[in-house]
């Protein structure tokens, strides 16, 4: 496997691959900053049977990606870089006929908006090349889709309503910190929310819809309706669906800090002069 990325999510993926060394006998960790990849190798090489190599690559540069894939010859490319780089990595996989997996859908770097249309447009080309692209294979999206599909297949004739509730019960003691890449997290939270009702998208203002939910073993948490990519794919694949919504929990300290950043213009996507 070729793993592209060396951030927090990549760290989880790399550890999981090394825990399953009978499947992932060899991995190459590649990122713009090779020293980060080397750090993972140093930490894990004595704890796993997986053979680990590292490489430097700019995931925005398709020829660089192609050269790395031709040199390493992976069976699969696991993309845990930034969502802006999805299409470049998919282009390289097409050229080298390598199967592709990612955890978040593409979004343009200059616009805080994400949807599947750009990646779904690759379907025919991947089919013709005889390779597979598994999109949004993290937890949400990913496991949430598996839960819904399993419920449809084994428990229900049809499903009319789906609410996905994303709650983090941990507390690291910081007044402001994100669960994953700060830029992506802040863009997601500050963008307009949306949900699907009777086959149509309904748009809301950012953080407009709030609910309080009592989570098992965690307790009551404030949660807010967000736009999220699995709404698109579930609406296409779940029979009888009338409404799908996605909620995520946030503490007031997080939201206050985010509002301060917004007020001083630091949530904008245009360059600062």
What are the functions of these language-model segments?
Residues 1-8:
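Conserved N-terminal Rossmann-fold NAD(P)-binding element of oxidoreductases
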Residues 10-14:
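N-terminal Rossmann-fold NAD(P) dinucleotide-binding loop
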Residues 33-36:
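Helix N-cap at the beta1-alpha1 junction of Rossmann-like dinucleotide-binding domains, i.e.
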Residues 46-61:
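Rossmann-fold cofactor-recognition segment
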Residues 57-74, 81, 85:
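Conserved Rossmann-fold cofactor-binding substructure of NAD(P)-dependent oxidoreductases
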Residues 80-83, 92-115:
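ADP-ribose/adenylate-binding Rossmann-like module
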Residues 104-132:
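Rossmann-fold NAD(P)-binding glycine/threonine-rich loop
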Residues 153-273:
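C-terminal catalytic/substrate-binding lobe primarily of soluble NAD(P)-dependent oxidoreductases
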